[in-house]
Amino acid sequence: MKIIAANNRANYNFTISNKIEAGIVLTGSEVKSLRINTGSIRGSYIIEQNGELWLSNSFIKKYQNSNENNYDPSRKRKLLVTKREFDKISGSIKQGGFTIIPLSLYFSDKGFAKLSCGIAKGKKKIDKRDSIKLRDWNIKKQRLLKNN
């Protein structure tokens, strides 16, 4: 598994309750561009339209040897999930307060581009502070155990 892009702020801004792996529909030049690590999912989000999931606001740079004239690097890209996963995701969204965020974009062992998504709930400012305090405390504990 080769990670191409990761959403590093996802764990800071959201509480992730469930993770789902989805395939992503790409053109050939987009796949070649991702193989040389020119993609980003920072600030991207997933929406549901007409019973399908779409990745919006992701950026995949145009492949330099591509001959596409009107290439849009931040176009919507369709996500491929099973019916059961889609029902689970749409149920969480309709429940309220939950959203779907992309966590990482990678190539599977078979060479397919995959997107790891998380069903998440947004954190408030005090929740973010609590998670920072908890992380710092865990670091201090490790240092104390290491020194003793």
Regions picked out by a protein language model, each given a short descriptive name:
Residues 67-69, 124-127:
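Short small-residue beta-strand/loop micro-motif enriched in glycine and branched aliphatics
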Residues 148:
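Surface-exposed, charge/polar-rich loops and edge strands
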Residues 2-98:
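Ribosome large-subunit tunnel/peptidyl-transferase-proximal elements
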Residues 82-118, 122-124:
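Beta-rich strand-turn-strand
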Residues 51, 72-74, 106, 119, ...:
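Short, charged/polar low-complexity linear motifs in solvent-exposed/disordered segments
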Residues 60, 128-145:
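Flexible glycine-rich active-site/ligand-binding loops centered on an Asp-His dyad
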Residues 1-2, 131:
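N-terminal nucleotide/polyanion-binding subdomain common to many enzyme families
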